[in-house]
């Protein structure tokens, strides 16, 4: 029996949460090896486990994969969540790059200087309402199907629904004008594998708080 994937990161969302979501949605059990100190990170580096000296790192199928996009691409390909042909894959890539752009803004919000946080949050909300959510609502409306690409579950649906949960944490009213996105969120959330991941006690991580931010500062020395 194949070994479970091993996820090396600290105990927070950060740049590993999308991998947790994708594996969970695919029904794949995984182990987490939490980095708890700067010394833990140094050991991974010194042992030659981190090609570019940084995490996330996932041990899977005899490889030690780094770089978030490479990790997600491999998992999506392995578990048939990356479209049926090159055209579908191109659409999926286009959608997830947009998702990643908005996700990066939300990811970096906790480390934003306090005096800039209100302006940054206002900018994020503006882009959600006027750029990103209308674009994805239009995709769903244009083909009238249940999923973003090919009327079949893909990584694009999973990454988008993960993002919808983050947006809901910022301001639950932001999705109210986008009924097809709301329906997609409900549909994906009710898939048995995703439903399990959304339950308390799963590997899903809570929003970044001051404690986990301080832990990150110590581990990554920033």
Swiss-Prot record:
Principal location class: cytoplasm
Superkingdom of this protein's organism: Eukaryota
InterPro entries on file: Glutathione-S-Trfase_C-like, Glutathione-S-Trfase_C_sf, Glutathione_S-Trfase, Glutathione_S-Trfase_N, GST_alpha, GST_C, GST_superfamily, Thioredoxin-like_sf
Subcellular compartments: Cytoplasm
pH dependence comment: Optimum pH is 8.0 for the isomerization of androst-5-ene-3,17-dione.
UniProt modified residues of type N-acetylalanine: 2
Entry keywords, A to Z: Acetylation, Cytoplasm, Isomerase, Lipid metabolism, Oxidoreductase, Peroxidase, Transferase
N-acetylmethionine modification, residue list: 1
Family recorded in the similarity comment: Belongs to the GST superfamily. Alpha family.
Record-given protein name: Glutathione S-transferase A1
Record lineage: Eukaryota, Metazoa, Chordata, Craniata, Vertebrata
